[in-house]
UniProtKB/Swiss-Prot annotation:
Phosphoserine: modified positions: S272, S349
Keywords: Acetylation, DNA-binding, Metal-binding, Nucleus, Phosphoprotein, Repressor, Transcription, Transcription regulation, Zinc, Zinc-finger
Function, in words: Transcription repressor that specifically binds the 5'-GGAG[GA]A[GA]A-3' consensus sequence. Represses transcription by recruiting the chromatin multiprotein complex NuRD to target promoters. Negatively regulates expression of EGFR, a gene involved in cell proliferation, survival and migration. Its ability to repress genes of the EGFR pathway suggest it may act as a tumor suppressor.
Annotated spans, Disordered: 88-125, 264-283, 359-389, 486-507
Skewed-composition ranges (Acidic residues): 112-123
Composition bias, Polar residues: 94-111
Places the protein is found: Nucleus
Positions of modified residues (Phosphothreonine): T276
Protein name (record): Zinc finger CCCH-type with G patch domain-containing protein
Any Pfam family hit: G-patch
GO molecular function: DNA-binding transcription factor activity; DNA-binding transcription repressor activity, RNA polymerase II-specific; RNA polymerase II cis-regulatory region sequence-specific DNA binding; sequence-specific DNA binding; zinc ion binding
Length: 507
């Protein structure tokens, strides 16, 4: 990448880092904060690498400039020496010899042609055009811009400096101090001082067609920061548009017709063939592809895990030019399927992990072919049946002979109640332990419900997705609390029955 692309990428990364830091200060859940902090660290590392690359490019450019100057001086001395050897020396004209430092090359025909073309380029100053913009992720986008003035590129080609009228990034937003001639940062400014564009790449200016905008359509809307952000129209009323920005950090706004325009990118349903074949849509973004790439089919839903999050990862990918269904990378040659995480046992070697996975696979295969076994009666905490007498034996035998009665081996609610009625001391202790654990779970669930309610109160009216997520968690916690209450009542009933039997049998 050249110096301009590296500077643009650096500004984009810094803007993304600022958005992540703003999101961290919004008071999110612990899991979302962990993801954002990891993303923050990755962006900082990426910024450091980009700065190092930019410094290396500038250093190499400076060294090449110095070497070129030395080479030109050597060629100029050799040229003077060749002229001195070929031209005859006139003794009478020695005093009229022109010094070497005053010798100037005669202008060539190409230089004269460029001087003749300069007035035509100066006429473009102040004109509105459709100028290209190469983003940091390798896409070519055409934006409406205004020509500031004519300049000459390093290779001598005719170029103009343009300022973009609808900036979507800080790197495209015109610097207000540069327009007044007071900017102190010059090339290091994070705002735009204009971009050099070849005259051959300019296209005619196209006014935005607001008739394409309607309720539910995507658009670009101007925010208070002066940038145009992607949004979606929710309502249209007498020339006023109510838009909802795609970014969760931006609130819903009402704008007029001069602060809204159709999106620069075509919809995802449009094919690349229609993009290249339709000349009327030339103002939209064009993705530069060196060749046709077979992206393959994705058998799994891309970013399916983001139903549990705010989807910051896929939104950053879309901002960097990624199109769903295509592979990663500049030419869409990367992987399509997401990487599935495999959690291995902690503290085990790779051989032991492989052996454990093989055992699990074999168990799954054998378990699928083995018929399900009948569940036994619930084992008692003491591991032995309750004491029985001769009357219990006779009752079981007589009831088993009566038609319509349950079998002796079937575990019925009456039998469970009777077993609990004759429960031993260890069974009562286990019952008390279960009741204590259930009460602890109820207290913990109540604390969770209070915490969720406080978070829901804080986020009401601020973050719609966060509020819905918290409401869902609150409903689940309340359902769990109801189940625990029912379990507690059942355990208390069993405990009272056991206490009643103890009081009636002790004299």
């Amino acid at each position: 990448m050249d110096e301009d692309n590296l500077e643009t990428a650096l500004q984009t990364y810094r803007a993304q880092l600022q958005q992540v830091e703003l999101a961290l200060g919004a008071g999110l859940d612990a899991s979302e904060q962990a993801d954002l902090r990891q993303l923050q660290g990755d962006l900082k590392e990426l910024i450091e690498l980009t700065e190092a690359s930019l410094l290396s490019v500038r250093k190499s450019k400076l060294l090449s400039t110095v070497d070129q100057e030395h080479q030109e001086d050597a060629e100029y001395l050799a040229f003077q020496k060749a002229i001195a050897e070929e031209a005859p020396v006139d003794p009478g004209n020695d005093s009229k010899t022109v010094p070497g430092s005053e010798v100037q090359p005669t202008p060539t025909s190409s230089a004269l042609e460029e001087e003749e073309e300069d007035p035509d380029l100066e006429d473009l100053s102040g004109a509105k055009v459709n100028a290209p913009y190469y983003s940091a992720w390798g896409t070519l986008e055409y934006h409406n811009a205004m020509v500031v003035g004519a300049e000459e590129a390093e290779d001598g080609s005719a170029c103009v400096r343009v300022l973009y009228l609808y900036p979507t990034h800080k790197s495209l937003k015109p610097c207000p101090f540069f327009l007044e001639g007071k900017c102190r940062f010059k090339e290091n400014c994070r705002f735009s001082h204009g971009q050099l564009v070849s005259v051959d790449e300019l296209r005619p200016f196209q006014d935005p067609d607001l008739s394409l905008l309607q309720t539910g359509s995507a658009c670009l809307a101007k925010h208070q920061d002066g940038l145009w952000h992607p949004a979606r129209i929710t309502d249209v009323d007498n020339g006023y548009y109510t838009v909802k920005f795609d970014s969760l950090l931006l609130k819903e706004a009402v704008v007029e017709g001069d602060s809204i325009l159709p999106p620069l990118r075509t919809e995802a349903t449009d094919s690349s063939d229609s993009d290249t074949g339709d000349a009327s849509d030339s103002s939209y973004a064009r993705v530069v592809e060196a060749n046709t790439v077979d992206t393959g089919t994705c058998s799994s839903a891309f970013a399916g895990w983001e139903v549990h999050t705010r989807g910051i990862g896929s939104k950053l990918l879309v901002k960097m030019g990624y199109e769903f269904g295509k592979g990663l990378g500049r030419h869409a040659e990367g992987r399509v399927e997401p990487i599935h995480a495999v959690v291995l046992p902690r503290g085990k070697s790779l051989d032991q992990c492989a052996e454990i996975l093989q055992k699990k696979t074999k168990q799954g295969q054998t378990g699928a072919s083995r018929p399900p076994r009948c569940r036994r009666r619930s084992s008692r905490p003491e591991g032995r049946p309750p004491p029985r007498n001769v009357f219990d034996f006779l009752n079981e035998k007589l009831q088993s002979q009566v038609p319509g009665t349950p079998d002796a081996g079937v575990d019925t609610p009456e039998r469970r109640n009777k077993d609990m009625y004759h429960a031993s001391k260890s069974a009562k202790q286990a019952l008390s332990l279960q009741l204590f654990q259930t009460e602890e779970k109820i207290e913990r669930t109540q604390r969770d419900i209070r915490g969720i309610q406080e978070a829901l109160t804080r986020n009401t009216g601020r973050h719609g997705m966060a509020t819905a997520h918290l409401q869902e968690k609150l409903e689940g916690a309340q359902r769990q609390l109801g189940q625990l209450r029912a379990q507690e009542a059942d355990l208390q009933r069993k405990q009272r029955k056991a206490d009643t039997h103890r009081k009636m049998t002790e004299f």
